[in-house]
């Protein structure tokens, strides 16, 4: 293992600390709720859902976090302003944890940014994400909001190489007038969480691991990803899924360890139902990484899995 020469930033979002040197802080884990085709959602457009089932899932993630010491974030996914508003209200009612506001639609993300600012929850909200498709109206909405935490996505549709992704953050890679980090500054983002973006296996999925290390070495910001998207989009594995769903789950959950070994600080692990599997897996990796850097002068946090489970 290794220690970065660059000072590593630790951000604090609603009490959850993210970042630092490998082995210093436990990996922060974010499970997604209300995702596409989530069985608890009854009306996608209006955001109607089974409240009891949703509460149980949120509590499931919380209890997993309490046991292993890995902090958690609730990843809210919505497709309309009405739905994401309902989801935010519910999550804030049930949990004190920070939450990601995520949507494939920029207008929905913009609405969510405005809404959390209006109701006084901007300090708990993490915008997902500032990326190459962001337009002037979305930038304006985010800048006018009170949100100061955001994921910054290193996806480059024209060049998925390490250089292409790094340049997207640094200078716009010739596709934007400025880099995404500069846009984040203009939007008032203080807590920058870099996501190298997970592309399909065979199309640069592994580059994200290299970029995690490279980005932390260059900028020192907390870095992580939704690495499970690589195995979940793997055609070969999906053909095996119907016959052996356990095999699929092993690969999906196991990908967590790869991102951690590449110095990842946070992981968007997908369906929140996977919490009972993800948290022990992440805790195991955190313990081994912390032991591996012990001779480099890196002390684990008091509630690190190394201090709770060994």
From Swiss-Prot:
The keyword Methyltransferase applies. GO terms for biological process: methylation; one-carbon metabolic process. Keywords: Methyltransferase, Transferase. InterPro entries: Dihydropteroate_synth-like_sf (IPR011005), MeTrfase_MtrH/MtxH (IPR023467), MtrH (IPR028342). It comes from the Archaea. The keyword Protease does not apply. SUPFAM superfamilies: Dihydropteroate synthetase-like. GO terms for molecular function: methyltransferase activity. Its EC number is 2.1.1.-. May be part of a complex composed of 3 subunits; MtxA, MtxH and MtxX. NCBIfam families: mtrH. Belongs to the MtrH family. This is Putative methyltransferase mtx subunit H. It comes from Methanosarcina barkeri (strain Fusaro / DSM 804). The gene is mtxH.
């Amino acid at each position: 293992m290794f220690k970065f020469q660059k000072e590593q930033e630790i951000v604090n979002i609603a009490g959850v600390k993210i970042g630092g040197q490998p082995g210093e802080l436990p990996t922060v884990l974010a499970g997604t709720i209300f995702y596409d085709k989530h069985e608890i959602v009854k009306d996608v457009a209006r955001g109607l859902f089974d409240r009891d089932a949703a509460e149980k899932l949120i509590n499931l993630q919380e209890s997993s976090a309490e046991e292993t010491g890995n902090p958690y974030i609730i990843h809210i996914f919505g497709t309309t302003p009405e739905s994401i508003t309902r989801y935010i209200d519910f999550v804030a009612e049930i949990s004190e944890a920070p939450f990601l506001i995520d949507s494939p639609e920029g207008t929905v993300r913009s609405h969510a940014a405005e809404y959390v600012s209006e109701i006084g929850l901007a300090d708990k909200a993490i915008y997902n994400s500032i990326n190459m498709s962001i337009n002037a109206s979305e930038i304006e909405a985010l800048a006018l909001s009170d949100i100061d935490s955001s994921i910054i996505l290193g996806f480059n549709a024209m060049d998925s190489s390490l250089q292409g992704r790094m340049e997207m953050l640094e200078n716009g890679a010739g596709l934007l007038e400025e880099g995404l980090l500069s846009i984040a500054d203009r939007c008032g983002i203080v807590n920058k969480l870099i996501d190298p973006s997970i592309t399909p296996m065979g199309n640069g999925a592994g580059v994200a691991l290299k970029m995690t290390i490279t980005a932390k070495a260059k900028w020192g910001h907390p870095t992580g990803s939704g690495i499970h998207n690589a195995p979940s989009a793997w055609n070969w594995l999906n053909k095996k899924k119907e016959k052996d769903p356990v095999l699929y789950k092993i690969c999906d959950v196991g990908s967590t360890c790869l991102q951690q070994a590449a110095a990842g600080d946070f992981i968007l692990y997908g369906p929140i139902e996977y919490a009972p599997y993800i948290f022990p897996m992440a805790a195991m990796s955190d313990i081994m990484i912390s032991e591996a850097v012990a001779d480099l002068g890196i002390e684990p946090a008091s509630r690190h899995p190394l201090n709770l489970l060994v």
